[in-house]
């Protein structure tokens, strides 16, 4: 299939709010795919290419962008093969080969395809095809039940392979997909609550647990063989030998565990999130020791626990790994839940998770059975630039470039602004229309897809924290930034400083 056909479908999907229209467009595309293209297509449609990140940044992407092809000729298989080559590059000479591969890829792409490829490589692709929508589309295209497709995708951990099976196999083969030790499943996800009291009203009696600022891990053990997977189901066993040894010590033969791992200081307090994540990089040094903590068990010695209540799963977990169970208590009392939340924050953790004791493990699903509660941080930042939107936001300025005040010039000009991140989340239609008009009135220059503006507009941004990042001059980046609203009552000189944000980093 030509890449152009997939790109046009993603544009159509992104431009409509109708779920039925999205599902129909995607189902028609899936029916036309060659079976060999199905896994790659599903990865691209969900903005999660099967190769993951391939080591290309915006500078490399910008340098590779040349004159686009006049007519579509690039195939989906061509793009998938190029991503494979980019992922495999390492060592001496890899930078030059990566640049050559990128130039060859973009030269064969039309302007529309170049924008799509850039989104894929930079992790900024927004296709409008969320996994739930695409799951429905697979079911429609294959004439299978949505529940059968969803269950197979959750338990296989791979919507691409599930789509291939649904579209080319039998209903019985799809129904036969089940939990298997050694094959990761999509993790259960949590909703967000405003307070522990509000969360308890939803969950009823709950396991109230510390929410650690670590890396989600899923650990599979069969005998002496232990495998560790990330929340995106990438295998990282070889990077975490200390976790492997801990799990080998548990009194079980087969087990699947869900939990987190993080770095701790000598005082037992959590170290900065970036120290934990440094162990997951390609060149990770093992100077930082990671400690595993578990909050769920999905299987033990031939017994699947997915469909057993959390209260039972907790008993199993406490029997096999009491020293590595995430701190928490079962309660229906808001005062007790509040105390646990305060204790978690005092210990340096993010907040708490409240989990209904009767809940089953819904792999890959986000719902009201698990609710996270943590304090929200808000800061006043300055808009430095804004990127043109795509899909439904075509023609509107969308993704904001955010800067913090640097009064002393520690990271640039005194009194200037240091970029700390981007976000398009939280923008309503009204805000999109307002900022599209406003920012063109204060435009100072344009680059490809971006309008740079006078640094005079203050916007209130909610964040979950900051993390170390070499991408920006201040060496930090916002975590989970979203727009609360514009502060027309404030001047840019009143914005929060880069020093204030850097103080959020743990020492």
From Swiss-Prot:
The active site is at 211 (n6-amp-lysine intermediate). One of its GO terms (molecular function) is ATP binding. The keyword Cell membrane does not apply. It catalyses: ATP + (deoxyribonucleotide)n-3'-hydroxyl + 5'-phospho-(deoxyribonucleotide)m = (deoxyribonucleotide)n+m + AMP + diphosphate. CDD domains: Adenylation_DNA_ligase_Arch_LigB. DNA ligase that seals nicks in double-stranded DNA during DNA replication, DNA recombination and DNA repair. Belongs to the ATP-dependent DNA ligase family. This is Probable DNA ligase. It comes from Pseudarthrobacter chlorophenolicus (strain ATCC 700700 / DSM 12829 / CIP 107037 / JCM 12360 / KCTC 9906 / NCIMB 13794 / A6).
